[in-house]
């Protein structure tokens, strides 16, 4: 529907300050979301910052006002929804609701379905292939590069920061943990 409206009404495609607001706001969300996800104090904060990142990607796609960007943004929103559902399912199996990174340590070995769910959700947020986030981010990245190469260069640091934060989460899921033996009362 949105794509049809964009092709029927040319005045929707005129360059306005609103378009620049969408693009700059989305770029800020991508970079800030990636940086905050890398420095997240808890896994719950990580997923909140990952949602900021993925929302920023979608806003940039919509802000480009081209068919490729709008299609990528729609796919990014579908990816975000599915990643949230999978992450919620993974967190249901985590003891203490994952209030600390130590709660996730070794989760991939002790509760494999929860570890896989959290790993897949993290990879979806960061747009790793073959998940739906990758084609969404690729379409938006290509549309940004076609519109102005500097936009693509500005998206890249946020993507790299998010990828690094995903590796942090994945390492936490598979590395051996101490468990909760340190808290066992005598």
List each language-model region with its residue ranges:
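Hydrophobic transmembrane alpha-helices and their helix-loop junctions in integral membrane proteins
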Residues: 1-138, 142-173, 179
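Glycine- and aromatic-enriched alpha-helical transmembrane segments of multi-pass membrane proteins
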Residues: 185-186
């Amino acid at each position: 529907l949105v794509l049809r409206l964009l092709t029927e009404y040319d005045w929707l495609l005129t360059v306005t300050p609103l378009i620049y607001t969408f693009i700059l706001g989305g770029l800020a969300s991508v970079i800030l979301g990636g940086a905050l996800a890398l420095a997240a104090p808890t896994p719950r904060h990580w997923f909140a910052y990952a949602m900021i990142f993925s929302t920023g990607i979608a806003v940039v796609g919509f802000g480009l006002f081209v068919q490729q960007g709008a299609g990528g943004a729609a796919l990014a929103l579908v990816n975000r929804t599915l990643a949230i559902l999978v992450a919620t399912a993974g967190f249901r199996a985590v003891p203490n609701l994952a209030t600390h990174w130590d709660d996730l340590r070794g989760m991939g070995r002790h509760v494999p379905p929860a570890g896989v769910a959290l790993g897949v959700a993290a990879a979806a947020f960061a747009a790793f292939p073959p998940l739906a986030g990758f084609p969404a981010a690729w379409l938006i990245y290509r549309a940004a590069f076609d519109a102005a190469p500097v936009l693509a260069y500005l998206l890249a640091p946020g993507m790299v920061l998010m990828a690094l934060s995903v590796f942090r989460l994945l390492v936490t899921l598979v590395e051996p943990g101490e468990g909760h033996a340190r808290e066992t009362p005598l």
